[in-house]
Amino acid sequence: MAKGLLVTYALWAVGGPAGLHHLYLGRDSHALLWMLTLGGGGLGWLWEFWKLPSFVAQANRAQGQRQSPRGVTPPLSPIRFAAQVIVGIYFGLVALISLSSMVNFYIVALPLAVGLGVLLVAAVGNQTSDFKNTLGSAFLTSPIFYGRPIAILPISVAASITAQRHRRYKALVASEPLSVRLYRLGLAYLAFTGPLAYSALCNTAATLSYVAETFGSFLNWFSFFPLLGRLMEFVLLLPYRIWRLLMGETGFNSSCFQEWAKLYEFVHSFQDEKRQLAYQVLGLSEGATNEEIHRSYQELVKVWHPDHNLDQTEEAQRHFLEIQAAYEVLSQPRKPWGSRR
C-alpha cells in the first residue's frame, strides 16, 4: 500500500523523536536510531521536516521495484559519514558507562559497540554496508589505543571510513508483519538500554568514575581551546547544578549525588591543573597579577611570532598558539569553589 505524505507528517509531529514516521515508512534502522538518540538529539528530527517528501517517495518507489540496483554504488555522503562517527562515539560512551567492568572490555565490548553504532547509521534508508569489514576495522583499531577512553574516537573514525568504502544498496526483501518488526526493534532497544540502566542504578560510583575519566581525556584534548572546554564542562555538570538548584544542600544526602559532587571536584581540579600549566607557559608563578600576565604575554608573543622566526616556523607557530591559549585561560576571572557550584 502506498505511503501518504500527510500521515507521515502527522506521525513525525506526534512521535518523531521516537521514530514513528520511519516505522510507518518501513525504515526500521532509522526508527531504531531515532529511538536510541531521541531523534538525533532533536536536531535530526527537526531537520527531517524538509526531507519527508523524499522519504515517502523512496518508500513508494521501493514497493514498486522488483530488484535492487546491482553494480551501482550509492553516492558518498559527508552527512552520513559524520553521523556514523558521532553515533559510533555515542555507542562507545554508553558501552564505557555500562560495560567497562567486563574482562577485555577494550578488546571486545568497546569496538563491538562502536562498530554497531556505525553500522546502524550505515543501514539508514536504502543503503547498508559490509558487516564483517566494518566490525573488523573497529577490532583492529582497538588494541592500538588499549586502555584509553579516548580510543572511542579513532575506532569510530576507522569503522566509519570502512563502512563508507563498502557502502551499497540494500537487497529487496519481502515485507514483514508489523509484530515481527516491533519485536526485533524491542529486543535491540532493550539490549542497548538494559546494561545502561543497570549500571546507572546499581553501580553509580563506578559509572561516574569512568565518565570522569572519559571526559577528562576529552578535556585534555580541548586544553588549548578554552571555549570548547568550558562548554564540555557545562554539559557534564548540568545535572549536578540543576539538582542543587532545585533541592539545595539537603538534596545531596543520596550516594548518587555525592558521587556527582566528586565528579564536580574532579573537573574543578582539572581546571586548576590547566591554570598551573598556563602559568608555566607564560613563565610566571601562580598568583601573578593581571599586569604581570599581560606584560609576559606581550613579550612572549613578540619573541615567538611566526613572522619573526622564519627559520623555525613550525616551532614558533606551536609556541605562539600555546601562549595565546595560556593567556586566554588566565584572563578568565576565577570563581571561588563555593560560588562555582
Curated annotation (Swiss-Prot):
<keyword id="KW-0143">Chaperone</keyword>
<feature type="transmembrane region" description="Helical">
    <location>
        <begin position="81"/>
        <end position="101"/>
    </location>
</feature>
<dbReference type="Pfam" id="PF00226">
    <property type="entry name" value="DnaJ"/>
</dbReference>
<feature type="transmembrane region" description="Helical">
    <location>
        <begin position="30"/>
        <end position="50"/>
    </location>
</feature>
<comment type="function">
    <text>May function as a co-chaperone.</text>
</comment>
<dbReference type="Pfam" id="PF05154">
    <property type="entry name" value="TM2"/>
</dbReference>
<keyword id="KW-0472">Membrane</keyword>
<dbReference type="GO" id="GO:0016020">
    <property type="term" value="C:membrane"/>
</dbReference>
<feature type="transmembrane region" description="Helical">
    <location>
        <begin position="185"/>
        <end position="205"/>
    </location>
</feature>
<dbReference type="InterPro" id="IPR036869">
    <property type="entry name" value="J_dom_sf"/>
</dbReference>
<keyword id="KW-0812">Transmembrane</keyword>
<protein>
    <recommendedName>
        <fullName>DnaJ homolog subfamily C member 22</fullName>
    </recommendedName>
</protein>
<feature type="transmembrane region" description="Helical">
    <location>
        <begin position="138"/>
        <end position="158"/>
    </location>
</feature>
<feature type="transmembrane region" description="Helical">
    <location>
        <begin position="105"/>
        <end position="125"/>
    </location>
</feature>
<feature type="domain" description="TM2">
    <location>
        <begin position="3"/>
        <end position="50"/>
    </location>
</feature>
<dbReference type="InterPro" id="IPR007829">
    <property type="entry name" value="TM2"/>
</dbReference>
<keyword id="KW-1133">Transmembrane helix</keyword>
<feature type="transmembrane region" description="Helical">
    <location>
        <begin position="5"/>
        <end position="25"/>
    </location>
</feature>
<feature type="transmembrane region" description="Helical">
    <location>
        <begin position="218"/>
        <end position="238"/>
    </location>
</feature>
<dbReference type="InterPro" id="IPR001623">
    <property type="entry name" value="DnaJ_domain"/>
</dbReference>
<feature type="domain" description="J">
    <location>
        <begin position="277"/>
        <end position="341"/>
    </location>
</feature>
